[in-house]
């Protein structure tokens, strides 16, 4: 069976479903770069995330 995508009002669920596999469970980095405190360093590259989400 398919698992439902996390709701927009569940940011932790969205991170676990969409980001953690590459960026680590605590966003410490892994296959992808560390995202912890990323807001204070850079902006998300254009096209990486659908702005509607």
Curated annotation (Swiss-Prot):
Record's bilayer topology term: Single-pass membrane protein
Residues of the signal peptide: none
Gene Ontology cellular component terms for the protein in this record: plasma membrane
Record-linked InterPro entries: Cyt_c-like_dom, Cyt_c-like_dom_sf
Record keywords, A-Z: Cell membrane, Electron transport, Heme, Iron, Membrane, Metal-binding, Transmembrane, Transport
PTM annotation, UniProt: Binds 1 heme c group covalently per subunit.
UniProt KW Kinase keyword: no
PROSITE patterns: CYTC
Major location (coarse): membrane
Pfam families: Cytochrome_CBB3
Keyword Membrane in annotation: yes
Domain of life: Bacteria
GO molecular function terms attached to this record: electron transfer activity; heme binding; metal ion binding
Chain coiled-coil ranges: none
Places the protein is found: Cell membrane
Residues that hold heme c according to the record: 19, 22-23, 44
Protein name as annotated: Cytochrome c-552
């Amino acid at each position: 069976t398919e698992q439902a995508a996390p709701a927009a009002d569940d940011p932790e669920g969205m991170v676990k479903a969409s980001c953690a596999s590459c960026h680590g469970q605590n966003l410490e980095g892994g296959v992808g770069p560390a995202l912890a405190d990323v807001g204070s360093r850079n902006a998300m590259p254009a096209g990486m995330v659908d702005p509607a989400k």
